[in-house]
From Swiss-Prot:
Keyword Glycoprotein: no
GO MF terms, alphabetically ordered: ribulose-bisphosphate carboxylase activity
Family, per entry: Belongs to the RuBisCO small chain family.
Record-given protein name: Ribulose bisphosphate carboxylase small subunit 2
Domain of life, source organism: Bacteria
Quaternary structure, from the entry: Heterohexadecamer of 8 large and 8 small subunits. Forms a CsoS2-CsoS1-RuBisCO complex.
Subcellular location(s) per record: Carboxysome
Description of what induces expression: Induced by growth in low levels of dissolved inorganic carbon (at protein level).
pH dependence: Optimum pH is 8.0.
Length: 114
């Protein structure tokens, strides 16, 4: 990766772990889902309008996917959330039940123009 591929940190939203990198590919998102599941964390989806993303709590899509071991189930929920909220940012969270905090989170969908 060259320095020209990294966005200017002063002119973009930094909403998640990978904000300064190019958007993740579908395979990279899949790998991150596998990582969350392998850590024993519960995947959960959050969504919010881009204009409110940095100063509001994000709404949760359904409930966290407690006990999910299949990354394809998580991908299906991401797609369902995207279809229901096509103009919202969608973030995947890996919730750690033991420490009761987020172990990982990143944006999996940005609407056009973001």
């Amino acid at each position: 990766m060259s320095i020209s591929q990294i966005d200017d940190y002063r002119t973009q939203y930094t909403l998640e772990t990978f904000s300064f990198l190019p958007e993740l590919t579908a395979d990279e998102i899949y790998d991150q889902i596998v990582y969350i599941i392998n850590q024993g964390w519960s995947p959960a989806l959050e969504h919010e309008e881009p204009a409110k993303a940095s100063d509001h709590y994000w709404g949760m899509w359904k409930l966290p996917m407690f006990g999910t071991r299949d990354p394809n189930e998580v991908l299906a929920e991401i797609d369902a959330c995207r279809q229901a909220y096509p103009n919202h940012l969608i973030r995947l969270v890996g919730y750690d039940n033991y420490t009761q905090c987020q172990g990982h989170n990143f944006v999996v969908y940005r609407p056009r123009g973001m």
